[in-house]
Regions:
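Class I S-adenosyl-L-methionine-dependent methyltransferase catalytic core
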Residues: 1-165
Length: 165
């Protein structure tokens, strides 16, 4: 199995901030009867190699340490999807019936996932693409559900590179 080599020194900080948010989010909902959903549209293999060579759990695996009722992980690369499935089955076997790992482009699949959501659910959607890969209509549709907290991280250099000069 191989780990993804994306990110930089900020990756560990970003993941720490995100897990602190998940802590607070689930505390806020602990006495609510909502079904809690987690969606990671760029789930990867589950592991990320930092610049110092150390491997850390990525957002998908970190989310499994939290008590959501359902998890949706999308990954376009079949090898990364298979690695994520392997790790989930071996480290989080008690949650496999709650986890949906989908091998597809998020732009093709997120719409159908969003249509399944109801007012009796609350969720977190984590969007951390490698470039500007997300169709804006998907982001718009996700925001219109009114039930998702959306984390959309994008590389500013990819955005500025596409601006008119």
């Amino acid at each position: 199995m191989t780990s993804q080599k994306f990110g930089g020194d900020w990756t560990a900080k970003k993941l720490n901030i995100f897990t602190s948010y998940l802590d607070a989010y689930l505390i806020a909902l602990q006495n609510q009867k909502f079904k809690k959903i987690y969606i990671d549209a760029f789930a990867g293999s589950g592991k990320t190699v930092l610049p110092d060579g150390s491997a850390v759990d990525g957002s998908a695996l970190l989310s499994l340490q939290y008590n959501f009722d359902e998890y949706y992980f999308l990954e376009i690369d079949p090898n990364r999807k298979n690695e994520l499935e392997y790790i989930v089955q071996n480290r989080f076997s008690e949650k496999t019936n709650k986890v949906h790992i989908i091998n597809d482009n998020c732009n093709n699949r997120l719409g159908s996932i969003l249509k399944k959501l109801t007012v009796y659910q609350r969720g977190v959607m984590f969007l951390d693409p490698y470039a500007l890969e997300l169709d804006w209509s998907i982001l718009s549709d996700a925001s219109k559900t009114g039930i998702l907290d959306i984390w959309y991280l994008f590389p500013v250099n990819a955005l500025t590179r596409n601006l008119p000069k």
